[in-house]
Amino acid sequence: MEKHITTPITQKITKDLRSGDYVYITGEMYVARDAAHKRMIEALDRKEELPIDIKDSTIYYMGPSPARDGRPIGSAGPTTATRMDKYAPRLLDLGEKAMIGKGKRSKEVIDAVIRNKAVYFAAVGGAGALLSKCIKSSEVICYDDLGAEAIRKIYVEDFPVIVVIDLSLIHISEPTRRVV
């Protein structure tokens, strides 16, 4: 099924998403990869506030190439999500509602998605140039010393993703296995 949604992504939205749905997202989301995730978890360990508003947020696992030709961002393809698996459950428990990446997730992440009524989307790997056309603005908001791995806030229009893990306990990456 094809769906169009806007951020922030809330439980009201996630409850209606099913594995295999084609979804087009419009709105603000964050971009962060493993180095930024590590720093966020270290900040939490030090009892510091996160540098982003995690409640009902969407984090796209991506490290963009430099912007060209007046575009807000360069190629913007997804990063392998397993690199964030050791950090994702804690952020989900704090209110993150959606993750975008590519590839499978660990059982711990799947459990956290279900527990927090969140969702994991996949973006098409190898389509970074095409995906970047959906990104209308991009701003580094913290950890700028990380370069391409800095946390960015982006605004997207009709950003195409596929639901991989939903709340039905069946996920597209292992369609014959029922997760309980």
Enumerate the predicted regions with their spans:
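Single conserved hydrophobic/aromatic residue that forms the stacking wall/gate
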Residues: 131, 171-180
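Feature captures the catalytic cores and cofactor-binding loops of soluble hydro-lyases/lyases
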Residues: 31-32, 36-159
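Short, structured beta-strand/loop micro-motifs enriched in basic residues and often containing a Trp
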Residues: 1-9
